[in-house]
Design a protein with these regions (language model features):
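Active-site-adjacent structural elements that line small-molecule/cofactor binding pockets in enzymes
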Residues: 1-346
Length: 346
């Protein structure tokens, strides 16, 4: 199982965080993910990280597909792969309607079909083929009558470092997970629960794998967790509980909350409904209190060293191949030491 770092949303401490990341690379960390959401864009930060690192893989965690044209997404991935010397993987996802429509001002429609078309177009660009695509959602070049009529198939001017840049798709629902297992090199999970994951995702993963091109290789399964080795996990788990309450209760509308839907499929139907009711009514403390202890503990990597080692084994046994951690230690030195300790436990 590979060990990686999940950077936080950029702010005043970005340069210091990258300085720290360089030290993590020296200690054996193999991959770093840079988020985007509706913060600073991930691409500019990834370029900075590429210039400061030499070995670790870089991935976007995630860029969403509605705010960029498919060919721009492909160009950007090829550019990041170029400046990093072939170390970039494209983390791509649909985000959700509140961000897509509320921040970018474009309709949130057909996320699965759009994702499939975008991946097809990206791979054409990376193979340096003249881009010709006639899909339901994207047409390249535009056909006669849809523009000036002067568009023609073009191929990327530059020769990409690699003709196949790995694609990591963020997926939660059964159909999106099945599609990911079919067409992508990697799967970005959400709130991965090692003991309950198979009951939710084993079927969709099997359905997609049956259609998978063997040339893609085995599916890389990425899970993100807050992490700390500590004999007193209470306050750190409370912080994770607050984050779960936010996502389950308020990260999306009542009728369209992917985190809430996932937790229901994990078997916490009553709790998910209660968390959402409390959160959307402004009762944040009650929403936190309603988050099941098992969900908090199982989606974090927080506790004594022996416990953390056991949980690492549980993640690996459940199929996770890349673990991206957010170290919770309060100082740079403590975070570096914690990640070195985790490296020894993996």
């Amino acid at each position: 199982m590979r060990l990686g770092i999940m950077l936080g949303y950029s702010g005043e401490g970005f340069a210091a965080a990258v300085d720290e990341l360089v030290e993590h690379e020296r200690s054996g960390v193999e991959i770093v993910a840079v988020p985007e959401a509706y913060s600073f864009d991930a691409v500019s930060q990834l370029g900075f990280v590429a210039a400061r690192t030499t070995r670790m893989e870089l991935t976007s965690g995630i860029v969403q597909l509605y705010s960029r044209t498919p060919t721009l997404t492909a160009m950007t991935a090829a550019g990041l792969d170029y400046v990093s010397g072939g170390r970039f993987s494209l983390g791509l996802g649909a985000s959700g309607p509140q961000v897509v429509e509320g921040f970018h001002g474009v309709p949130y429609d057909a996320p699965l079909a759009r994702t499939r078309e975008i991946v097809e177009i990206c791979r054409q660009v990376w193979r340096r083929e003249p881009v010709v695509h006639s899909g339901r959602h994207y047409r390249v070049p535009l056909p006669p009558g849809a523009g000036t009529g002067l568009g023609k198939p073009l191929k990327l001017i530059n020769h990409p470092v690699r003709p196949r840049i790995p694609v990591i798709l963020a997926a939660v629902g059964p159909r999106s997970v099945a599609m990911t297992a079919e067409i992508a090199e990697g799967w970005w999970t959400l709130f991965f629960h090692p003991e309950r994951a198979a009951s939710v995702w084993a079927g969709p993963l099997a359905d997609g794998t049956r259609l998978r091109d063997p040339a893609l290789g085995p599916l890389d399964v990425l899970a993100t967790v807050p992490f700390a080795v500590t004999d007193d996990p209470g306050s750190l788990l409370d912080a994770h509980r607050a984050m779960l309450a936010l996502y389950i209760g308020g990260m999306g509308a009542r009728e369209r909350n992917f985190s809430n839907e996932l937790v229901r499929r994990y078997g916490y139907e009553r709790e998910a409904a209660l968390i959402q009711d409390h959160f959307l009514s402004g009762r944040r403390a009650e929403a936190m209190a309603a988050v099941p202890d098992d969900l908090v503990r199982s989606t974090a990597l927080v506790g004594p060293a022996a416990y953390v080692k056991d949980r690492l084994a549980a993640y690996a046994a459940a199929g996770v191949t890349t673990l991206l951690v957010s170290p919770l230690a309060p100082t740079r030195e403590a975070r570096l030491a914690a990640v070195r300790q985790l490296r020894d436990l993996v």
